[in-house]
Design a protein with these regions (language model features):
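Redox-cofactor binding/interface segments in oxidoreductases and associated redox assembly factors
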Residues: 103-104, 137, 263
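A secondary-structure boundary/capping signal
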Residues: 68, 138-140, 160, 231, ...
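Hydrophobic anchor at the start of a short beta-strand
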Residues: 86-87, 135, 260
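N-terminal beta1-alpha1 cap of cysteine-dependent amidohydrolase-like domains
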Residues: 2-118, 123-128, 186, 193-213, ...
């Protein structure tokens, strides 16, 4: 396999996040419904919508997406594909009683940490997490959630029982993509969800139909999930309260702890909605 400059269709998400733009000729080669095209359209707008109501069939509350910095538009685009309502969180007053789950996107964790404080969003999000409500952190979001960082003295929410190493995979030009299963269950208890299939709990709630068989989200294993790393962290130490959901070459890159999901990679930069479906089913 030859060297890649991250401008091919496979690696284009890395190019967009690293350089903040994308070559139009490559975007033109993608289907107009491709999540990357949708996300770039969000980013390109001078003023994007701060709220999306979601489809009438969606049975989910509103997902608040931290939108002070980072890849929040890509998460919003992914939720739009699933018909799930969302709201961008830019200031403390944006966090209201409609929010029943939160996404902490990738970006620059130190900058996000400072902006969380200056916008007044830190306290309501911390209270949300302390109440045991669902939260999903990707890349920088994992760093914000960690109990401790092994190469940084900052501690943010400190809710995830893990020690995380910032920028463990090095510089942005060292970013890469891989594939691995996501889920800790094994044997007969595992419910395998192949690429292109819906996560059971999400599929039932989105259709409005009740499930005839109760399936715990703990038992779900997402087969062959695409992992996109952009100067990502990994988990240096896993505490007893957290469960390893996925590893790559011996490094832990996905954790779950109750209703906390955390990934070192960026599922929002792929066309695979399964982790977002899993999050919405918590």
């Amino acid at each position: 396999m030859g060297a890649c400059d991250f401008r091919c269709c496979t690696c284009l998400p890395l190019f967009v996040v690293m350089f903040g733009d994308s070559p139009n000729d490559l975007l033109n080669n993608l289907n107009e419904e491709h999540p990357l095209v949708v996300a770039v359209e969000y980013i390109s707008k001078e003023e994007s919508a701060d709220v999306a109501a979601g489809s009438a069939s969606a049975k989910h509350g509103v997902t608040g997406i931290l939108a002070v910095q980072g890849a929040f538009a890509e998460h919003a685009a992914m939720l739009d594909r699933l018909g799930a309502p969302w709201k961008l969180l830019r200031a403390a007053e944006d966090f209201d009683d409609s929010i029943d789950r939160v996404i902490l996107p990738g970006g620059e964790s130190t900058t996000q940490g400072k902006l969380l404080r200056s916008t007044g969003l830190f306290e309501p999000i911390a209270a949300h997490i302390a109440a045991g409500k669902p939260v999903f952190g990707t890349c920088a979001g994992m760093i914000l959630l960690a109990r401790k960082l092994d190469n940084d003295s900052n501690i943010y929410f400190g809710a995830l029982d893990a020690v995380v190493r910032r920028n463990a995979y090095g510089r942005q030009l060292g970013s890469f993509a891989a594939t691995a299963d996501f889920g800790s269950s094994s044997g007969d208890s595992a419910v395998l969800v192949e690429p292109g299939e819906r996560v059971p709990g999400f599929a039932d709630s989105a259709s409005g139909a009740g499930s005839t068989t109760e399936i715990s989200s703990d038992s779900i294993v997402l087969k062959d999930f695409p992992l996109v790393f952009i100067r990502g962290p990994f988990v240096a130490e896993v505490g007893s309260a957290a469960t390893v959901e996925t590893s790559l070459s011996g490094n832990v890159v996905g954790l779950r702890q109750g209703k906390i999901l955390a990934t070192a990679f960026h599922p929002e930069l792929t066309d695979d909605t399964r982790i977002h479906e899993l999050f919405l089913s918590l």
